[in-house]
Each structure stands twice: as structure tokens, then as C-alpha cells.
């Protein structure tokens, strides 16, 4: 049973995180039914796992004019749009069932539609897209902690973040608000996703937005959770999904605490990283913003082992993608 196995998994993760009880927001989280979780593989057959990432879409429901610099000239093209992204995702899944889709934050702030509905209008849209995993960004707190929990709790897929805690007052730290990690078990390999959002949220934005939440630096528990994923969960590949901004993500990838991490799929600063930035311990990428791009990390798997990884920044060109109905 899909639900039973998933609840067992998040229960184990909660024990690791020191979470004594599961809230409804966690129990309601289920991976997309469209995602292939087939753990079997044929001997000597080559499989490709495609991990697709969006970030910082900021409620841009429709295609918009995106600026490109080409041949020393400014060029504008219509890109993005959730209906176009839905078409892209469906084509990707049809082409390769071993596709896993994530969004790394800032999905409920940035448009009049979101403001007038306190973000609620975006929930059915995101659920229709069939994401497999979410990370809260710095703007998920725009309507306050309770609304953040309600909005993210209404999304079908799991949410992870290892550095957002309930603030019990007087500097006392409570439990993690979200699970710290999620594992995709497919084709004989286990991919661990560990989430971190920007701990500077109470400084860079009004502290009233994030009242009731304590943030910690990623490096505080990163090594611990990498060890949990590698040693306890026996993950073959560890990905940090982050909403820290490119400079913080590069900084993190060069810290000893990041040893054992393969990739940081980042967000926040809207950077178009076309070639992975190789740091001391991990590669760092970021797929732009506003739904104009999708980051595609492809992992090659043979006999239950990951033999190669490649990355591409894909433009969501509206003219090439018919709007999904």
C-alpha cells in the first residue's frame, strides 16, 4: 500500500529528526502517483533517472516576457506559465517514467492572485502539476506561520526542511516543522534529498512574517544528516535542495560539513546556472526563476550503481509548449 509504506518511511525519518509526533501536515504528504518507484532493474541495463527542478516561480501562472542576452543584444521571449510547465512535465514523464520533480521554494508570493486568496488559488494548480517534493522558500512565510503550514499542508507531495523549527519562546527550540529529508528508492538506488532554506529570513524580511519559527544555519546539522542518509539509510546519492541563494550555496558546498553531498539544487537568487559549479565537496546549480527554466539533473544507473551525472538548464519556451488543459 503506497500510503502505508510512505507513512512508515516518514515515521522513521521523524525519529531521526527527534520528532516525537507527526502532525496532520506531515501525514497528509504523499509522493506523486505518477512517479516511478520501481526498485527492480535488469542486469546490465542502463537506466536514466531525471530529476527536474523549478524554483522561485513566484505565482507567475501565465507566460511572460523573459530577458535574454544573445549576440550582444537584449532579446525578449515568452517563457514559463504553469500550463506550459505541465505540458513539459507530462512529456518528460512519458519519455522517461523514472522522472522526479521538485520545487525549491517561493511558490506562494508574487502576484495579485496570490494576495487576494492568501495563496490558496495556487494549491490546486501545484497539485495538478504533480510535483514529488517541495522545499519552503524565504517567501513561504509571507502570510504568517499558520498560513504557511496550511498552504504547504494542502499540497499532495512531501515537504522537507532541516533548519526550520517551532519557536517555543525565550530562545527555546521545538521540533522541526517539516521532515529533514526524503528518499527516492528507484532502479536499485536510493537518492536522498535533504532540505535547507535561508536562515536569514527574519533579518532580510519583516520578522513578523516568520514569527513562531526558529531558523538555524545549514552547517549546524548538515554533516549529521549526510551521515544519516549515507550510513543509516544507505543512500547512493545525496542531494541538498536549498533556498539559500547562490553565494550561500557555494559557501556551503566548500565546507567540510558538505562532504558526502553530490549536488546542491539551489534557489532564491534567480540565477541561471547553465554549467554546474564544481566546489570542493559538491556541485551547485540554480535554474533561474518565474518558471522560465527547468533544471534537469540526469543520473545514469547500471546494475544498481550510479555511473554518471549530467545537468542541463532547459528553457520553458511558451511557443514550443502547448498549454495543458
Spell out what each predicted region is:
Residues 323-325:
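Hard-cation-handling environments
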Amino acid at each position: 500500500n503506497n500510503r502505508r509504506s510512505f507513512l512508515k518511511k516518514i515515521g522513521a525519518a521523524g525519529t531521526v529528526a527527534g520528532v516525537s509526533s507527526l502532525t496532520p501536515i506531515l501525514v497528509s504528504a504523499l509522493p506523486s502517483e505518477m512517479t516511478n518507484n520501481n526498485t527492480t532493474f535488469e542486469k546490465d541495463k542502463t537506466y536514466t533517472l531525471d530529476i527536474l527542478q523549478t524554483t522561485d516561480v513566484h505565482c507567475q501562472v501565465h507566460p511572460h516576457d523573459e530577458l535574454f542576452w544573445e549576440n550582444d543584444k537584449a532579446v525578449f521571449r515568452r517563457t514559463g506559465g504553469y500550463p506550459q510547465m505541465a505540458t513539459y512535465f507530462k512529456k518528460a514523464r512519458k519519455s522517461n517514467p523514472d522522472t522526479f520533480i521538485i520545487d525549491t521554494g517561493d511558490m506562494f508570493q508574487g502576484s495579485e492572485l496570490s494576495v487576494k486568496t492568501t495563496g490558496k488559488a495556487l494549491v490546486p494548480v501545484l497539485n495538478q502539476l504533480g510535483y514529488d517534493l517541495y522545499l519552503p522558500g524565504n517567501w513561504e512565510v509571507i502570510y504568517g506561520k499558520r498560513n504557511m503550514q496550511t498552504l504547504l499542508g494542502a499540497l499532495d507531495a512531501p515537504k522537507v526542511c532541516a533548519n526550520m523549527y517551532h519557536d517555543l519562546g525565550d530562545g527555546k527550540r521545538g521540533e522541526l516543522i517539516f521532515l529533514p529529508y526524503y528518499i527516492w528508492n528507484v532502479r536499485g538506488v536510493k537518492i536522498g534529498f535533504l532540505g535547507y532554506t535561508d536562515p536569514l529570513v527574519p533579518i532580510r524580511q519583516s520578522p513578523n512574517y516568520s514569527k513562531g519559527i526558529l531558523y538555524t544555519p545549514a552547517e549546524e546539522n548538515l554533516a549529521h544528516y549526510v551521515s544519516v542518509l549515507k550510513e543509516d539509510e544507505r543512500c547512493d546519492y545525496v542531494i541538498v535542495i536549498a533556498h539559500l541563494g547562490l553565494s550561500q550555496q557555494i559557501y556551503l558546498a566548500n565546507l567540510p560539513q558538505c562532504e558526502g553531498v553530490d549536488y546542491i539544487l539551489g534557489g532564491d537568487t534567480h540565477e541561471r546556472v547553465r554549467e554546474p559549479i564544481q566546489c570542493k565537496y559538491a556541485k551547485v546549480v540554480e535554474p533561474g526563476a518565474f518558471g522560465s527554466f527547468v533544471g534537469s539533473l540526469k543520473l545514469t544507473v547500471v546494475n544498481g550503481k550510479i555511473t554518471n551525472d549530467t545537468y542541463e538548464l532547459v528553457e520553458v519556451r511558451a511557443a514550443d509548449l502547448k498549454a495543458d488543459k
